[in-house]
A protein has these predicted regions:
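Intrinsically disordered, low-complexity segments enriched in small/polar residues
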Residues: 1-144
Length: 144
């Protein structure tokens, strides 16, 4: 059941025409031992299926770069919330992460990252406290 919900969430990371949003370049700034906490994030296979047992590579370094390949904006109590698929490489092997971020302001018109100009976008990603590993990892994201 949860697997089906995960797969549905992954497939919802498309725009109205059914194509992937992006790609947008981004820099993932890892702070507060975020590399360890990223192991709690589910991975998405290249085929778009969720693999709840997959773990991101441990050697993600602060300032690691990747490509945001899709976003799925959702309206929540705290504003716009989005599922972001983040693609990077580990030893030359592509791997895609999925993590949930509250967009909200200061993004224009409460738009998601997908609506920002498709240029190099620097993101400062830090965990939202308190961190609860029992729920989907949530990170605050703001453009710089």
């Amino acid at each position: 059941m949860q697997q089906q919900q995960r797969a549905k969430s992954a497939s919802s990371s498309m725009n109205a025409e059914g194509t992937q949003v992006g790609p947008l370049k981004a820099t993932l700034l890892i702070t507060n031992n975020l590399a360890a906490q990223l192991t709690l994030v589910n991975a998405v296979l290249e085929q778009g299926e969720w693999d709840n047992n997959a773990k991101p590579p441990a050697q993600i370094e602060p300032g690691a770069t990747g490509t945001i390949i899709a976003t799925a904006p959702l309206i929540g109590e705290s504003g716009i919330v989005g599922d972001v698929l983040y693609k990077t490489e580990s030893d030359g092997v592509p791997i895609v992460f999925a993590f949930r971020v509250p967009f909200g302001k200061p993004f224009p018109n409460q738009a998601s990252i997908a609506h920002l100009p498709p240029s190099n976008l620097l993101l400062s990603v830090t965990p939202v406290e308190p961190f609860d590993p029992q729920i989907s990892p949530v990170y605050s994201v703001s453009p710089e």
